[in-house]
């Protein structure tokens, strides 16, 4: 493999694909993991219509398309669509030839084995890459924060994980996974707006709600206290939001009621434990000797951890759960929305990592199962 070929780093999330070149400090392209198929093929004579649209283009034309997400809860469910997303990433977004660059892909923890094999197969057979590697998202987030031991609380659009890592090795028996993340909060926000008399129902309107959620929501340090405040002095929590058509709407207690579901999933009718309990249970599944280090290195990652005050609230909740003398430290890096990608960029540009790649020769010799031997 030529020395000068820079690796490509592609972080496939349920909501967004983050991609770019190894060594950069931020992804070059970020676009929604969406495929759009026209509802009425070729209805417009003389209009050039594609068979399918990917990413932002699908987002912009969503009125005439049926939208599909090939990655559900962090796991690829439709490989043909996934291949289209990768094709779009390489050729339209990054504008590179994949056969000239090694590619680092990311995967969810506890990913089915067949999924990793299929990823490997598509990279070598459809894109003809010279080398590739698959890394678990949480490890990359930890590397990006400059640590090798800690518990990563990664919450994106489709899935939330708590992953304990010791000296760079994931402890798989202690991973907790909840299929409750950003997308569920967006749906909950839509429901809260309905109660206020605003209706948002279509996929197009869902994107507006997602934007409101990302711009205006925050975590209450004390939920009951905040509710009381919002009832007594509404103006303290109210904010205005301008819709695309120019109308203004008022957003009030929804601002903290929506993300509260992270700590209390029963608000949205889910039986799973809250974020703090999931993290605590993960730590308790680990050896007693390393728990202290984990409590002291709780690293947040992913877009759904971007709410204001989430670090403080998590610290309070964990302090209540942990043994009295335990020191709790929550690390919330400002760039945590992209920390998986940043960790991938760091890892793939290390000189010591270059011998870790799965090469085309190794793949031709062993087939897709090589991924389990080389990527762990």
UniProtKB/Swiss-Prot annotation:
Q: Which CDD domains match?
A: ASKHA_NBD_actin
- Name-wise, this protein is Actin-2
The Swiss-Prot or TrEMBL record describes its family as follows: Belongs to the actin family.
Tele-methylhistidine is found on 73
Regarding activators and inhibitors, the annotation says:
ATP hydrolysis occurs in the polymeric state. Unlike for mammalian actin, ATP hydrolysis also occurs in the monomeric form and the release of inorganic phosphate (Pi) is more efficient.
User: Where's it found, cell-wise?
Assistant: Cytoplasm; Cytoplasm, Cytoskeleton
Q: Which GO terms describe its molecular function?
A: ATP binding; hydrolase activity
Q: What else is known?
A: ACT1 and ACT2 differ in their polymerization, filament stability and helical structure. Unlike mammalian actin, Apicomplexa actins do not form long and stable filaments.
Which of this chain's residues are annotated to bind ATP? 14-16, 18, 157-159, 213, 303
Q: What does this protein do?
A: Actin is a highly conserved protein that polymerizes to produce filaments that form cross-linked networks in the cytoplasm. Polymerizes into longer and more stable actin filaments compared to ACT1/actin-1. Has ATPase activity. ATP hydrolysis leads to the formation of a stable intermediate ADP-inorganic phosphate (Pi) actin, which is followed by the release of Pi. ATP hydrolysis affects filament stability; ADP-bound actin depolymerizes much faster than ATP- or ADP-Pi-bound actin.
The primary gene name is ACT2
Known EC number(s)? 3.6.4.-
Taken from the record, one Pfam family name reads Actin
Query: What's the catalysed reaction?
Result: ATP + H2O = ADP + phosphate + H(+)
**What are its GO cellular component terms?**
cytoplasm; cytoskeleton
According to the record's subunit comment, the protein's assembly and interactions are:
Monomer (G-actin). Oligomer (F-actin). Polymerization of globular actin (G-actin) leads to a structural filament (F-actin) in the form of a two-stranded helix. Unlike for mammalian monomeric actin, monomeric actin is able to induce oligomerization with ATP or ADP. Mg(2+), which is used to coordinate ATP, is required for polymerization.
Key words of the record: ATP-binding, Cytoplasm, Cytoskeleton, Hydrolase, Methylation, Nucleotide-binding
The domain of life for this entry's organism is: Eukaryota
What InterPro entries does this protein's entry cite?
Actin, Actin/actin-like_CS, Actin_CS, ATPase_NBD
